[in-house]
Amino acid sequence: MQISDFILVIIGSVALAAGVKYVFTLTSGSNKDKKGGEAEKGKQVEKALDPQEYRKFQLKEKFIVNHNTRIFRFALPNEDDILGLPIGQHISLRAVVGGKEVYRPYTPISSDEERGYFDLLIKVYEKGAMSGYVDNMFIGDSIEVKGPKGKFNYQPNMRKSIGMLAGGTGITPMLQVIKAILKNPSDKTEISLVFGNITEEDILLKKELDELAEKHPQFKVYYVLNNPPKGWTQGVGFVSKEIIESRLPSPSDQTMVIMCGPPMMNKAMTGHLETIGFNESNIFTF
């Protein structure tokens, strides 16, 4: 189920005139915001991104995911505009924090099928300059965005199998690729995702991932938790070489592994993959 398939239920007192931030929770409902990926006849679809300059986008809505993670929805200039972000690419956010310019890369969890806005899943860190800045924005405030950026360009059926290793909010570029593959009937790429987190509550977008796996046999997901709950039946501890060997495709010219997580995780995973037999050309780190 996509974010655009939810209705918004306001919790707490909010008052735009008083400058109070909007806080939302999510329940299933209407998909009225989703316009679809096809252009209406007679209308030109405008891409909102510019790779050469930063453009301002207003915060439209804010969704609470858990105690430290939010989904921020930013409005595009017109309701029929698309962000214009190729699969596998990301955007750069710029803001002035404490008198200094701060830049951070983010991958939207929305796609160009959702017109008029884009969604960012952001974990708010206690001392995170950009995440704290965005979390403190009021509805109507603007953030500067530039893109597309990135070196990964996904093409349908570019490999027979793609393995994915994600940690925390590193799930965002993975979800972008997963959804692109699964919505294309002619793309037969097999996808295997290993997703590491600390607790079950930390697993972001779990419901959507589980629904995609249930609906599409070509997609499999395996969760690994440092601190699992009682009765947990999947991976425990850290993502190991043994887990990678059993859950991801074997090395070959027709397979590759893409990963996104904390730097220490990426370094460890690269070591495991090389030990298993993956060469550098078949490994990509976001």
From Swiss-Prot:
Keyword entries, A-Z: Endoplasmic reticulum, FAD, Flavoprotein, Membrane, Mitochondrion, Mitochondrion outer membrane, NAD, Oxidoreductase, Transmembrane, Transmembrane helix
GO terms for cellular component: endoplasmic reticulum membrane; mitochondrial outer membrane
EC number: 1.6.2.2
Subunit: Monomer.
Family the entry assigns: Belongs to the flavoprotein pyridine nucleotide cytochrome reductase family.
Compartments reported by the entry: Endoplasmic reticulum membrane; Mitochondrion outer membrane
Catalytic reaction equation(s): 2 Fe(III)-[cytochrome b5] + NADH = 2 Fe(II)-[cytochrome b5] + NAD(+) + H(+)
Identification of the protein by name: NADH-cytochrome b5 reductase 1
Cofactors: FAD
Binding site for FAD: 135-150, 161-193
Family annotation (InterPro entries): CBR-like, Cbr1-like_FAD-bd_dom, FAD-bd_FR_type, Flavoprot_Pyr_Nucl_cyt_Rdtase, FNR_nucleotide-bd, OxRdtase_FAD/NAD-bd, Riboflavin_synthase-like_b-brl
Domain of life: Eukaryota
